[in-house]
Amino acid sequence: MTQVDTAPSNFIRNIIDSDLQSGKHQVIHTRFPPEPNGYLHIGHAKSICLNFGLAEDYPNALCNLRFDDTNPVKEDADYVAAIEKDVRWLGFKWAGDIHYSSDYFEQLYDFAIELIKKDKAYVCALDAQQTREYRGSLMTVGKDSPFRNRPISESLDLFARMRAGEFAEGSMMLRAKIDMASPNMKMRDPVLYRIRFAHHHQTGDKWCIYPMYDFTHCISDALEGITHSLCTLEFEDHRPLYDWVLANISIACKPRQIEFSRLNLQYTLTSKRKLHTLIEEKIISAWDDPRMPTISGMRRRGYPAASIREFCKRIGVTKQENTVELASLEACVRENLEANAPRAMAVIDPVKVIISNYDENKTEKLIAAIHPKDESMGTRTVTFSREIFIDRADFREEANKKYKRLVLGKEVRLRNAYVIKADQVIKNDAGEITEIHCSYDPETLGNNPTDGRKVKGVIHWVSAVENQAAEFRIYEPLFLVENPAAAENIDEVLNPNALVIKHGFVESGLSDALAEKAYQFEREGYFCADNKDSSPERLVFNRTVALRDSWGG
């Protein structure tokens, strides 16, 4: 059975299968074509997994990584490097070298001249406001530009002079000559080239005219031999222009554009423009902030690459627009970490426990499983001592029977250690508990109490003598509403508790936790060492997801 046989079926795969069976194509060639004007986000992950996944599944198939870099004003080499890094981290390899649309600028220019010579394009001198007015609306047809029927020779001359830098930005543009009465606004003599005196990260200052996306994209696909050009549904009304350009130039390859629904995720914003604003207003620290929906942000937060790929596989590929529950993504992350993350103990909101009947000069090295369901991971050693820390939420002076943790006058088991009983509390002047004095049953290490009494609760702990101080960053969704994109004012729907920072302790064995190393902190959640701020001298752990789904109400 081949990978194609086991891959989930969808309408795009059905089209590809039909094209292969009919002999229309012998080899499938796709591409992932981001614009380098920001970081990739979870929405891009769906396209990455689709395009590169097809190349992995079909025999001899290829997938290019191409940067659609036609707007030097917004693009940057740093974004190029970040995108490359994200695609690699997700586990994909592109065919051959990286491609850039700017690699084809000379050929694109020649194709533009061909259109002019065929009287399919003309140089227009309308300004931006006039162009909008002449275009009309969905309710009214447009009207021809006064420059639409200028002589071919004149347009050729002006276009050459545009390239030579003789005209100011906004004073001239090259437009396709299609149909100003078309019901599709994209076909009303769209702009093919505009003047931009801007430094380009690939071509430097060689060019001062730059092709528009709709002109560049289809030709780049054709030049690279792309068979199936896959894009999201907002490009559906661009397809007639895609086909028109290729039909009117001398190029053999005619890729087929196919649209699929974009990924919309609850409580998540994927507009690059709005994400830029969050950074500019210092609401978010950077593109890789763990609260961001970017691939690098999710990586820093601790999402495994495999869990993102699995999520994209589960949501599938359709033409139906919908919004996916954030819980679905978190479930994929949780399943991966449950199976693979080593266990450790961490106390995030510590209060000291003193075990009065334990020798103050004694410590014990206790053995604990690294993973309770995977013996192959082995064991770890944890230090037990007279003074330990427990989480403040794991103690109450009074509680009902449902509270299965430590209560004054009652017993609880310490994970991987002994049964203890709370005998006394010490408080400061503000009435806050500073110490809990307990006694332990020395016969209960790995055993139930010998007299048959039942101890139901189990809590985690960390030695107060051997530990590592740590900062814990507890993350929640950045927005309070399911659809933040619909909010008139983003500031009003920001979650003030999207990041809560706490300070506590972890087992001493975590002092050398590597960047992005994932752990299940028992009874607390899944965490990873921050890939920017954590070091042996200052441990910083990001909470990736809670232990359980909290979205069910």
Curated annotation (Swiss-Prot):
Subcellular location: Cytoplasm
Gene Ontology BP, a term: glutamyl-tRNA aminoacylation
Pfam family, any one: tRNA-synt_1c_C2
Name of the top EC class for this enzyme: ligase
Binding site for L-glutamine: D68, Y213
Cellular component, GO annotation: cytosol
Disulfide bonds: none
Family to which this protein belongs: Belongs to the class-I aminoacyl-tRNA synthetase family.
HAMAP family listed in its UniProt record: Gln_tRNA_synth
Name of the protein described by the UniProt record: Glutamine--tRNA ligase
Protein encoded by which gene: glnS
